[in-house]
Design a protein with these regions (language model features):
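PLP-dependent enzyme catalytic core of the Aspartate aminotransferase-like
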Residues: 2, 335, 339-420
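A glycine-/small-polar-enriched, mobile loop at the entrance of the PLP active site in fold-type I
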Residues: 3-61, 65
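Active-site C-terminal subdomain of aminotransferase-like
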Residues: 14-15, 195-282, 391
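Conserved beta-loop-alpha segment that forms the PLP phosphate-binding cup at the N-terminus of a helix
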Residues: 55-83, 87, 91-96
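Active-site phosphate-binding strand-loop segment of PLP-dependent enzymes
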Residues: 116-176, 189
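Conserved active-site segment immediately N-terminal to the catalytic lysine
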Residues: 183-195
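Conserved PLP-binding catalytic core of the aspartate aminotransferase-like
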Residues: 290-324
Length: 420
């Protein structure tokens, strides 16, 4: 098909040209004396993205799912009780992992389209006077349903109950896109991945651990090997890794961290909200459809899950968008499979990018027999964006810029080139 594929799934996301160029490097010795310069760029940059002074970031060659496992196995023991809410496919998968590795999961089942049930969490934690619950799990942004939860409210529930449980947060599709405050929210383990707001290919699991969580590794009895933080801590102390790191992705990560710092986290968060509001205007005002998120307080600024009329299979809309218009939309998962499609609006994105998503989805819906007014989605989104001030992150900038700074023998955009 002529032209390029327009990728609007909620991860993997579009990769900026700068980041792609930064990853175009020849391989090098990851145990060379020069290698630690790369690590010294990455770890401080990640701390800024997590908004932490006290947390310790870790980078694994894995997906975000790998870091789910790392968070749990480095802090807990077989039979430990954890509190978790299930309100979407990814909150369900974390619960499933905890069950399979031998934890006692106290599950709060919620309607899909809602988020973490703060009052139920508060009641359960207050009633747990013996402190049998060792950790509380919270999915910050549930991509299956387009729902964002209030993590500060979970911390308040823990504090009001004077409960010592660890707070684990899935920030895979929120970090670097939606406001995330590791220190302010008292998070103990935060999990993310490279393929969302960090604007990289999949392949890096990102974890941030509090001092309290790191202390727990000394008593944790769950089996671990590949994800043992002791190995990472010992190797990272000298700028190295306990096994082969994903070198190309790490050079890309340096560049993406530069882009994030240049735009500014507050501006990035504002940009994602502004763009998401335009998409939501297209869905609700233009097309007259509903979002899976039940209330505005749950709306995600990185993904919108669009509910379809009865009798319409979302898979048909997604297939039509891809096969006819070369637009990739996200599918419904598990309980909502076939009932919706998802538009991802995170990472390196602007208004005109999203106009392509909206128009492609609209044409596909019309082709599948859904009665929407042609042009209504783009009109509604455009009206919102034209009449609201664009965040500074959408001011025209040099997207072809490439970092030139060097530390030691390493360029921040790739290994030093030695000319002979």
């Amino acid at each position: 098909m002529a032209g390029r594929n327009f990728l609007f799934v909620p991860g993997p996301t579009n990769i900026p040209d700068r980041v792609m160029r930064a990853m175009m490097v020849s391989m090098e010795d990851h145990r060379s004396p020069a290698f630690p310069a790369l690590t010294r760029e990455i770890m401080p940059g990640l701390k800024k993205v997590f908004r932490t002074e006290h947390g310790t970031p870790f980078v694994f060659p894995s997906s975000g799912t790998g870091c789910w496992e790392a968070a749990v196995t480095n802090t807990l023991s077989p039979g430990d009780r954890v509190l978790a809410a299930r309100f979407g496919q990814f909150s369900h998968l974390w619960i499933d992992m905890c069950t399979r590795i031998g934890l006692d999961v106290q599950i709060v089942d919620c309607e899909w389209g809602t988020g973490v049930p703060l009052q139920q969490y508060a009641d359960i934690l207050k009633a747990d006077t013996e402190h049998r619950i060792k950790a509380v799990l919270a999915c910050h942004n549930e991509t299956a349903t387009g729902v964002t939860s209030d993590i500060s409210g979970v911390r308040e529930a823990l504090d009001e109950a004077k409960h010592p449980a660890l707070l684990f947060v899935d920030g895979v599709s929120s970090l670097g896109s939606i406001d995330f405050r590791f220190d302010d929210w008292g998070v103990d383990m935060a999990v993310s991945g490279s393929q969302k707001g960090l604007m990289l290919p999949a392949g890096l699991g990102i974890l941030c651990a509090s001092p309290k969580a790191l202390e727990m590794r000394h008593s944790a009895q769950l089996k671990r090997a590949y994800f043992d933080l002791n190995d990472m801590i010992n190797a990272n102390a000298t700028g190295y890794f306990p096994y082969t790191p994903a070198l190309s992705l790490m050079y890309g990560l340096v560049e993406s961290l530069h882009m994030i710092e240049e735009e500014g986290l507050d501006n990035i968060v504002a940009r994602h909200h502004y763009l998401a509001e335009g998409v939501r205007a297209a869905v609700t005002k233009g097309w007259g459809l509903k979002l899976c998120a039940k209330e505005a307080k749950w709306y995600s600024d990185t993904v919108s899950a669009v509910m379809l009329p009865e009798g319409i299979n979302g898979a048909d809309v997604i297939a039509r968008a891809f096969n006819r218009y070369n637009v990739s939309l996200g599918a419904g998962l598990s309980k909502v499979a076939g009932k919706l499609f998802r538009i991802g609006h995170l990472g390196d994105m602007n208004e005109v990018h999203l106009m392509a998503a909206i128009s492609g989805a609209e044409m596909a819906m019309l082709d599948c027999g859904i009665k929407v007014t042609p042009g209504s989605g783009t009109a509604a989104a455009g009206e919102y964006w034209r009449h609201h001030s664009a965040p500074s992150g959408l001011i025209v900038r040099d997207t072809h810029k490439h970092s030139k700074e060097t530390h030691g023998t390493h360029s921040l955009s790739g290994p030093a080139v030695v000319k002979g």
